[in-house]
Amino acid sequence: MIRIATEKDSCILAEMAVQMWENQTAEELAAEFAETIKDENSAFFIKSENDTAVGFAQCNLRTDYVEGTESSPVGYLEGIFVKEDYRSKGYARELLTACENWAKDMGCSEFASDCELSNTGSLYFHKAMGFDEVNRIICFKKSII
């Protein structure tokens, strides 16, 4: 079953998300998600099996420029995660479809995403789901003080 997450789900989401976004703590993510869930331009979907949360997806509407797109707003997959023991069952595809349907309902005609250059698993997932690669970048910074 897939359902839209509520503020009460923030900790459940964070417990999964910390496995994907390791530079943040579960507590930080739970607080961030509790606020983001309230935003009508964001949605979280939870996939459950036997009443256990086994995956989630986060999507947003982006009105700023999104690489390779021609419309606005654009539905954007911010993150998608399925617990290791539940992978290869089509759950990520189901979560992505929920996000895409939400974006369509919000008036979007395009849906986009990104991944780190080193995340080959995510790259293969996106391509298998019908995404077209539109750019590869490396970002730079330096101190000027």
Can you say where each PLM-predicted feature lies in the sequence?
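Active-site rim helix/loop that mediates acceptor-substrate recognition in acyltransferases
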Residues: 25-48, 58
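Glycine-rich acetyl-CoA-binding "A-motif" of GNAT/NAT acetyltransferases
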Residues: 51-55, 91, 121
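Conserved active-site alpha-helix within GNAT-family acetyltransferase domains
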Residues: 93, 105, 117-136
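Conserved acetyl-CoA pyrophosphate-binding loop and the N-cap/start of the following alpha-helix
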Residues: 86, 90-98
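A short beta-loop-alpha structural element at the N-terminal edge
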Residues: 1-13
